[in-house]
Amino acid sequence: MIRITLPDNSQREYAGPVSVADVAQSIGPGLAKMTVAGKVDGRLVDASDVIDHDARLQIITPWDQEGVEIIRHSCAHLVGHAVKQLYPTAKMVIGPVIEEGFYYDIAYERPFTPEDLAAIEQRMKELIAQDYDVVKKMTPRDEVIQVFRERGEEYKLRLVEDMPDEKAMGLYYHQEYVDMCRGPHVPNTRFLKVFKLTRVSGAYWRGDARNEQLQRIYGTAWADKKDLEAYVKRIEEAEKRDHRRLGRELDLFHIDEHSPGTVFWHPKGWTIWQGVEQYMRQVYRDNGYQEVKGPQILDKHLWEKTGHWDKYRENMFTTESEKHDYALKPMNCPGHILIFNQGVKSYRDLPLRYGEFGQCHRNEPTGGLHGIMRVRAFTQDDGHIFCTEDQIQQECINFTALLQKVYKDFGFTDIIYKVATRPEKRIGSEESWDKAENALIESLKASGCDYQIAVGDGAFYGPKLEYTLRDAIGRHWQCGTIQVDPSMPERLGAEYVGEDGQRHRPIVLHRAIVGSLERFIGILIEQHAGALPVWLAPVQVAVLNITGAQDDYCREIAAKLQKALPNQGLRVELDLRNEKITYKIREHSLQKLPYILVVGDKEKAAGAVAVRARGNRDLGVMPLEAFISLIGQDIADKV
């Protein structure tokens, strides 16, 4: 007898081995029809898999998250089925599930076009309508090789070579099409009706730009049509907010083929960049950080000491001079430790906080570059706190409070807190890990933060806190971090004299709030859909005349605004063009300016201005001093 225990702890007995689908059928035909897969003793299996021992079983349906992911994975296989029917010479590579979707990498002699994508999607719908069963066959290794050799699927053969210890592999058959996978997959194509192919992009075999280029077809799939429609709306909203498009439309920056992965900042974009940097510089000053500046290029021997030369060299830009090897720094921490090492440091100097707007270079693959979000040259608000083990908790409390204020000023209040704990492979004693992890956890508790434990996600040398922003359309952006590091101070010989008169190693806390300024500005642009807060907007107010009769008064207004606020003038654009006022208002509105001041004869006679706020809000006519007070309050309130 086989005893099956269900999630409600009820039990069912069967005379012999029984499949997941059979168990579902014995419970009821409705459940059987909705069964995507099963979870046996916590392990996902196909609906056709047989249970031959007493076990706990959960029936997986499309309404379970695992069910949705299985649907997505099976949709990737369906892409393969459709592609091979339409383009028989295409070679299939891999088709995994990703967040909210899936993709399939394909080798083909020409790029797929939007018309190809539409044809593939249509063929997938036709295949789904055939309502065929997806058949799983566990197949001996030699037969798997034979199957793919006969079909000319060279990439599948390479993947088989990557698994020398596998004696048998799962082959999933979609009619004449076959794919290799660990599974599980849906039992029938009727589960795949709610899907959409979204785009095609380039990719590389094994993600390495030195390998052959592939094409990646992306798609999404859901259990319910409403979920798909909501997803499509989110994607459409994300496209409207795409920082690359807004960067062009608002004349902020561009990326040029002459320097891939680096940003050409235009005047308005550079104004935003300077605004973020100056704000963060004031944060340094107000919170006990000493700003430092390290060199861009450092000798190979330093990178050998830190371990980067062996483990990170492929991602570093290197050069040679006078028979010495150098590298552009991919991070700022070694330079800060070299600064710390100059002169004798005492326990009285700790915690010692260094901050730098350090430009770093990382040789990211071309295919991974993305606007100003993923670049090769970037500037970090990089800080390093040299402290003792006992000071970690308080420094983390201080850092979390500071980070929350900074994010709020930039328009983010929804933060996810994670503690990344010790990985399997690590250095240091268990006691030191216990103390460090406990300090991080207690710091979040003291800060009143709910947090998640990311088990095993810490670095090999220490745990860290990760701070992830949730933006206006629900996307997650991991920006802030504070990382405990007892290793690099030891590698580079950092010491301080303790209260006992002996030399000790400091702990280094690597910390960043915005991280890469380039990436953070990209996030800001998308968060605010280009309509940046008044204090950050590259142009805060435009002054528009109706006719030439108001030109001198408009110039007078602009001059006053540019000197209006203590220690800072407003960023003003004066538009005296001989164009219709409606045309000028529309043009400046499209540039997402916070305020537009319109001046006609009545306003000139009254010494006033007609104020239009962003979002086509008419605030009426007011004295110039009243407007200065209004915009000054906006800037002070960071809105």
Curated annotation (Swiss-Prot):
Catalyzes the attachment of threonine to tRNA(Thr) in a two-step reaction: L-threonine is first activated by ATP to form Thr-AMP and then transferred to the acceptor end of tRNA(Thr). Also edits incorrectly charged L-seryl-tRNA(Thr). GO terms for cellular component: cytosol. The lineage of its organism: Bacteria, Pseudomonadati, Pseudomonadota, Betaproteobacteria, Burkholderiales. Keywords: Aminoacyl-tRNA synthetase, ATP-binding, Cytoplasm, Ligase, Metal-binding, Nucleotide-binding, Protein biosynthesis, RNA-binding, tRNA-binding, Zinc. Its main location: cytoplasm. This is Threonine--tRNA ligase. It is found in: Cytoplasm. The keyword S-adenosyl-L-methionine does not apply.
